[in-house]
């Protein structure tokens, strides 16, 4: 698996924004990725970033309805990345930097 295919997108929720103040970043990652691979992908994608720890959460599929038909959303995996104290911050929102 290519390192740049591991991270899909950042998770932008109220809970993840509070964790951002503590230096914890939340990303949706490939379901086949393990913690060491996620750590390598984050350090390769963002310059000057050192990862202290990686916590992962498997998100179960939710039942959704369209009219009378029921189906399920896809299962996903979230990774909560904690950076070291001497690490650079990850620039998630480029508009804030301007």
Curated annotation (Swiss-Prot):
The alphabetized UniProt keywords are: Ribonucleoprotein, Ribosomal protein, RNA-binding, rRNA-binding
A Pfam family reported for this protein in Swiss-Prot or TrEMBL: Ribosomal_L23
Q: Which Gene3D superfamilies match?
A: 3.30.70.330
Top-level taxon of the source organism = Bacteria
Which GO terms fall under molecular function for this chain's record?
rRNA binding; structural constituent of ribosome
Q: Which GO terms describe its cellular component?
A: ribonucleoprotein complex; ribosome
GO terms for biological process? Answer: translation
Q: Which InterPro entries match?
A: Nucleotide-bd_a/b_plait_sf, Ribosomal_uL23-like, Ribosomal_uL23/eL15/eS24_sf, Ribosomal_uL23_CS
Claim: Metal-binding is one of the keywords in the record: no
Q: Where are the transmembrane segments?
A: none
Q: How does it assemble?
A: Part of the 50S ribosomal subunit. Contacts protein L29, and trigger factor when it is bound to the ribosome.
Summary of the function given for this chain in its UniProt record? One of the early assembly proteins it binds 23S rRNA. One of the proteins that surrounds the polypeptide exit tunnel on the outside of the ribosome. Forms the main docking site for trigger factor binding to the ribosome.
Q: Which family does it belong to?
A: Belongs to the universal ribosomal protein uL23 family.
Q: Which PANTHER family did the record assign?
A: 60S RIBOSOMAL PROTEIN L23A (PTHR11620)
Q: What is this protein called?
A: Large ribosomal subunit protein uL23
* Source organism per UniProt: Streptococcus equi subsp. zooepidemicus (strain H70)
Phylogenetic placement of the source organism: Bacteria, Bacillati, Bacillota, Bacilli, Lactobacillales
Identify the coding gene: rplW
């Amino acid at each position: 698996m290519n390192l740049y295919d591991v991270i899909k997108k950042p998770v932008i929720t109220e809970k993840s924004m509070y964790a951002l103040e503590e230096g914890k970043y939340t990303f949706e990652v490939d379901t086949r990725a393990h913690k060491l691979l996620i750590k390598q992908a984050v350090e390769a994608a963002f310059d000057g970033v050192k990862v202290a720890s990686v916590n992962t959460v498997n998100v179960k599929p939710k039942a959704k309805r369209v009219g009378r038909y029921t189906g399920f959303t896809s299962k996903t995996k979230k990774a909560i990345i904690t950076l070291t104290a001497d690490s650079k911050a990850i620039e998630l929102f480029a508009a804030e930097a301007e």
